[in-house]
Amino acid sequence: MNPLTRRDIIAHQASVPWPHQRQVEQDLLLCRAMAALFNDTFLRGQIAMRGGTLLHKIHLAPAVRYSEDIDLVVFGNRPEDHVAKAIRRVLKPEFGAPTDSIWDTIRLAIRNTVRPSRVLRLTYSVASVIEPGASLDIVVEANVTERVPHRPVVAIPFAFAFREATIAAQVNGYDIHEMLGTKLRALFQ
């Protein structure tokens, strides 16, 4: 995809309620990441989206809550490292390589030990167009343990305007009932 410009971010501001251009920029980056992930043939057969970004950007659009990450669940039968390599391959043209932090690695190792599910986390640090010298973090997390969903994965249309075109994807995800149930469960945990 083409690098973002200040004009792209200002144009995207018309479609989101965020008061700060930095948030608008990060929202546009998330949109581009979602489209890239779910327009990839391999990943489309392996991952589904869940979490607040799916809930607010697709089910409850226009979004009323700001999102900073993409939560995925791996439902396909390919090994975790194949999925991780594919995510890196697909997002590299957009964000470069994910950043490595010893503290993030330690936190994730503790999290994966304490909780019954295992998570793969990739954090991308992207130079901001709106605030030169600053960076935006895009976090992609994939649960690699919960491979058999309680309810069926559904293809949900997702699209956003970018320059003179509309970028679209069929995002694998869960219906609104499953999403609200998941959020309610998280509140009680």
PLM features: residue spans?
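Compositionally biased terminal segments of proteins
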Residues: 1-189
